[in-house]
């Protein structure tokens, strides 16, 4: 059966390229709904569950928590999982071409109605949790949730859940009777509340002023009861809670507020997911404002094992198309710079609006900017995410106006048709899913980029000027000679092009407000890796390698120079390989493939091999006095501690909240049950000062979290 399957797959691929049709999910493992660790071929549709569709009126909240006329946007409106199921079954979501749904946090939230500034507020958004092992009754019960998962999977759609382990719900230190006092429950049993927190489940350091990363991590986000992740009970609780949801078939996790949780704990947490029974794609929210870059954001994306929402991309697209404050040249500069900054650019989740920013569509304005921004995002590097209602041109500035009830399910809008036309390209053309990005033609109003992967290529041309057409000359591409029609079929005033020998495109005029996509898909005769997921793991974990041209007979996978063959190859298909991470030195390494005929692939760089199972340890050093501009770092004998390399040392450490200067601390993900040798160093002004004396030693716990405290050695 296996060899016959491969022959059928090869035939299907050949026919699809000849006829220009999309393949069903079964034909290509990398594009399948079963591919839970890589989302490069997917299009995500973000749903605020309460605001999408009310499919079951019997679960609507009673009393003051519910707004029957939907006039108070801070109350529940009735959207639920059954409503989403209905929109899958009636073809609205499948017809649009989306292949993953990102839904609100599904866990039980508080039912209290809280009055802020005279206005009643509720947990409709899902971010005021009380029990991470129960469902939000307003969305449905576990049977409803399982039905959503099963229905989505039956229609080749993945399900991503929002998950917010940063906090529970609003609390007032001086008023235990406020709301539900931030109470945390474990499957119905109270673990503790913010007041009288004898178990140390929460931080009690006041509210953050957002002045520093440290302040945002170890203080409350607004009035939300902030979780103490350096607590064994909390660590175990969240690991068991997420395993419950993953066991139901969830395909991905979006983590809320990753900037506001200890980075070491998050790395340890996601490593437990990747090494568990249900590894899935993960991405987090690290908010960046317009024109803002953040080295800590880049470091988190490259080191934590978790991917991120691409706020830098989103803010630039909004400035270029929505606000017209930046040019297309600026846009390409962001595309180029982010591709060099982020190690895993194909995993960054791109978007143009969401529940935390003004809707992209501006009230009273034309719709072409929205349509062009969608076209770019659907064909750009990364994993595109579309906010519910953007395809219906919903408007609304700020919370809660950007979270109104879905206004329409019209399948005839131009935006809906743009998504419908371009979303399938992510599965049919690997250049869109995995390709590099090159600028081919640019001025202030026009950008033409090429996506290329192996022998497949696509050109995307956008003229944002709604009143002036532009003559395009001197355009070169990787497209073979021939005539190419616009994938959008002129929906956004695009045109066909003719390509001559050497990839030269015959001169043409790009219409005012015009957008076109031209593409070519070819079979690969040589192996080409497009993505590897997860991007972090320990020996014994299974990784998925997606791409093209691997062939139908197992060859060899390499982690650095260490070969994986035989039983180390879990499965081998032309577009996907699953392999076991071998026993290799921990740290960043390359992953490559050699086919059974001996042809070598490109190298996927920066796969992060962990030493072993991870736990979180707080390292604290006292009496570490420094001069202005000098900070304290941690370095040690494990790869997770930089392998004694000062350039890879952990830090800079913190010294203002949990402990104060001259004490310094940092929460670090380190190998479990392992004796560590470590020291602290001072870095500043290009100078490194090592701690004196012998190495500190500490044996990490086999599970949970730990703390080690030492004095600086002069």
UniProtKB/Swiss-Prot annotation:
One of the record's GO molecular function terms: alpha-amylase activity
Binding site for Ca(2+) 2: 166, 217, 226, 260
Residue ranges that the Swiss-Prot or TrEMBL entry lists as coiled coil: none
Renumbered residue ranges of the record's region A1: 28-165
First and last residue of the signal peptide: 1-27
Region (B): 166-229
Active site per UniProt: 256 (nucleophile), 285 (proton donor)
GO cellular component, one term: extracellular region
UniProt cross-references to InterPro entries, sorted A to Z: A-amylase_C (IPR031319), Alpha_amylase (IPR006046), Carb-bd-like_fold (IPR013784), CBM20 (IPR002044), Glyco_hydro_13_cat_dom (IPR006047), Glyco_hydro_b (IPR013780), Glycoside_hydrolase_SF (IPR017853), Ig-like_fold (IPR013783)
Assigned EC number: 2.4.1.19
Keyword Calcium: yes
Cofactor binding note: Binds 2 calcium ions per subunit.
Region feature E, mapped onto this chain: 611-714
Cofactor(s) listed in the protein's UniProt record: Ca(2+)
Binding annotation for Ca(2+) 1: 54, 59-60, 78, 80
Binding site for substrate: 127-128, 167, 220-223, 254, 259-260, 355, 399, 403
Recorded domain comment: May consist of two protein domains: the one in the N-terminal side cleaves the alpha-1,4-glucosidic bond in starch, and the other in the C-terminal side catalyzes other activities, including the reconstitution of an alpha-1,4-glucosidic linkage for cyclizing the maltooligosaccharide produced.
PANTHER family (UniProt xref): ALPHA-AMYLASE 1, ALPHA-AMYLASE FAMILY MEMBER
Subunit comment: Monomer.
Protein name per UniProt: Cyclomaltodextrin glucanotransferase
Source species of the chain: Paenibacillus macerans (Bacillus macerans)
Organism placement in taxonomy: Bacteria, Bacillati, Bacillota, Bacilli, Bacillales
Name of the coding gene: cgtM
